[in-house]
Amino acid sequence: MLLTSLLQVFACCLVLPAQVTAFYYYTSGAERKCFHKELSKGTLFQATYKAQIYDDQLQNYRDAGAQDFGVLIDIEETFDDNHLVVHQKGSASGDLTFLASDSGEHKICIQPEAGGWLIKAKTKIDVEFQVGSDEKLDSKGKATIDILHAKVNVLNSKIGEIRREQKLMRDREATFRDASEAVNSRAMWWIVIQLIVLAVTCGWQMKHLGKFFVKQKIL
């Protein structure tokens, strides 16, 4: 029985492709909250967050407006003297994707940013961390790659069509040029033949007139 349970747990671990951690915490003002994650080189780290502010009239938390509330996220490599590798400023809700370039402990810091009275308002931050292999890209990345691939295929198709049209135009130009040269050649030979006929005719007429004048004793 125990062996069966262990096998079931092991099978579940194999099925799950990534580690997911979801939680929320409360803060006030622009308090910076940091979390530590051990990431190996090539690990894909994804964070999803949503900030809500406390409404006294509703006596509950509500979504913060995008115009007057934002969230700043920093990722630092603690093993490299807190080297800053990500600095992202977003709206009250959003996501972040990071690919670890080195193995070691990383510090993920979340800091709400607000203006006016919201800077002192009670804030609830919902956070979800997902850690997986870089081979398991997120759906947005795959969709973007598919879109770009489709655009490249369309461009290649258009380029091929343009090349075919250019080849057709070159073939038509070559045909027209050959036809023009043939017409010009025929016209030139026709002129030459006409000149020859005219010269022969003139010569024959001159000779005939000479004989005529001799008979008439004009010459």
Curated annotation (Swiss-Prot):
Which locations, inside or outside the cell, does it occupy?
Endoplasmic reticulum membrane
Q: So where does this one cross the membrane?
A: 187-207
Q: Where is it found, in Gene Ontology cellular component terms?
A: COPII-coated ER to Golgi transport vesicle; endoplasmic reticulum; endoplasmic reticulum membrane; endoplasmic reticulum-Golgi intermediate compartment; Golgi apparatus; Golgi-associated vesicle; mitochondrion
Keyword Transmembrane helix among UniProt keywords: yes
Q: Which UniProt keywords apply?
A: Endoplasmic reticulum, ER-Golgi transport, Membrane, Protein transport, Signal, Transmembrane, Transmembrane helix, Transport
- Membrane topology note: Single-pass type I membrane protein
- Cytoplasmic-side stretches of the chain, per the record, are 208-219
GO terms, biological process: endoplasmic reticulum to Golgi vesicle-mediated transport; Golgi organization; intracellular protein transport; protein retention in ER lumen; vesicle budding from membrane
Q: State its role.
A: Involved in vesicular protein trafficking.
Family affiliation: Belongs to the EMP24/GP25L family.
The protein here is known as Protein ERP1
Q: Which organism is it from?
A: Saccharomyces cerevisiae (strain ATCC 204508 / S288c)
Name of encoding gene: ERP1
